[in-house]
Amino acid sequence: MSNNELLEIEPMYLQFPFELKKQMSCSLYLTNKTDNNVAFKVKTTNRNNYCVRPNYGLILPKSTCKVLVTMQAQKEVPSDMQSFEKFMIQSVLASPGVTAKEVTREMFSKESGHVVEETKLRVTYVCSTTTNITSSPRTRRGFIFQCFC
């Protein structure tokens, strides 16, 4: 659970089952904790690797929005099954009467004087149930594993 005043974010990390040459998805739930409309925007450090739907929008008071994050098919296993990619959820109070189509980039601009809450989420990979763990491992900080999909 997040410490934001506007949104409760679940989960606080994005966990993708990993299989080579397959798109994988996970869900993110954004809950508006306020009595006002809240606009949100999802950003990532690697836009080419992920598809986020919706990547921005408006959440009505005390409502929840499901965001689907899809990782594009990977051609090789990441080193040590580690990801250094991150996501950031930005949220702001929206004026009454604003619709989802009226959510703009400027609403998330701190330079324009808007109060923007930001929450960073890490990406983790887990071996899928079809993944085999072998005895010729890669090691890192005492963990030994290698996944083949």
UniProtKB/Swiss-Prot annotation:
Record carries keyword Acetylation: yes
CC per GO annotation: endoplasmic reticulum membrane
PROSITE patterns listed in its UniProt record: MSP
Domain of life: Eukaryota
Modified residues (N-acetylmethionine): 1
N-acetylserine sites (modified residues): 2
MSP domain sequence ranges: 6-126
Keywords: Acetylation
Key word Acetylation present: yes
Alphabetical list of PANTHER family matching this protein: VESICLE-ASSOCIATED MEMBRANE PROTEIN-ASSOCIATED PROTEIN, VESICLE-ASSOCIATED PROTEIN 1-1-RELATED
Known role: May play a role in vesicle trafficking.
Protein family: Belongs to the VAMP-associated protein (VAP) (TC 9.B.17) family.
Protein name: Vesicle-associated protein 3-1
